[in-house]
């Protein structure tokens, strides 16, 4: 699963997701992409599940790029713990995804295979997504 090798601070504030993605909104590496339509925290487990769903369907053909990285730690307190006594320990990592962000890209497969692979990947994610094609793609 994806996570940073080391971080400057173990715990971060939650923050809020305002507006649309400013960068990473167009297909850069492959010919096809999966774009987020809603804001969300995507966990490293969800990213990995989507990646596996795509690569299994594509059967080792083509290449997949993951354009998001989970660099935000999410803390949790143990169950049945009273309030107070500090912030919980980091439990998992999330990528902050805003609307318009391209999360996955693929190349080296036909448009039909890519469409189905991204549909399977989208089922593993907690947000609405959209299949996009590079403007200069000629299939």
UniProtKB/Swiss-Prot annotation:
Keywords: Ribonucleoprotein, Ribosomal protein, RNA-binding, rRNA-binding, tRNA-binding. The gene is rplP. GO terms for biological process: translation. It comes from Chlorobium chlorochromatii (strain CaD3). One of its GO terms (molecular function) is tRNA binding. Part of the 50S ribosomal subunit. InterPro entries: Ribosomal_uL16 (IPR047873), Ribosomal_uL16_bact-type (IPR000114), Ribosomal_uL16_CS (IPR020798), Ribosomal_uL16_dom (IPR016180), Ribosomal_uL16_sf (IPR036920). Binds 23S rRNA and is also seen to make contacts with the A and possibly P site tRNAs. It holds the Pfam family Ribosomal_L16. Belongs to the universal ribosomal protein uL16 family. GO terms for cellular component: cytosolic large ribosomal subunit. PANTHER family: 50S/60S RIBOSOMAL PROTEIN L16, LARGE RIBOSOMAL SUBUNIT PROTEIN UL16M. This is Large ribosomal subunit protein uL16. CDD domains: Ribosomal_L16_L10e.
């Amino acid at each position: 699963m994806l996570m940073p090798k080391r971080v400057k601070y173990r715990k971060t504030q939650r923050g809020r997701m305002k507006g649309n993605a400013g960068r990473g909104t167009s297909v850069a590496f492959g010919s096809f992409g999966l774009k987020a339509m809603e804001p969300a925290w995507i966990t490293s487990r969800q990213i990995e599940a989507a990646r596996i769903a795509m690569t299994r369907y594509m059967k080792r053909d083509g290449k997949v790029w993951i354009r998001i990285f989970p660099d935000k730690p999410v803390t949790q307190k143990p169950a049945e713990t009273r309030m107070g006594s500090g912030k919980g320990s980091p439990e998992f990592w999330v990528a902050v995804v805003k609307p318009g962000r391209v999360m996955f890209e693929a190349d080296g497969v036909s448009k039909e295979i890519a469409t189905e692979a991204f549909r399977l990947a989208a089922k593993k994610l907690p947000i609405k997504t959209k299949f996009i094609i590079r403007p200069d793609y000629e299939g």
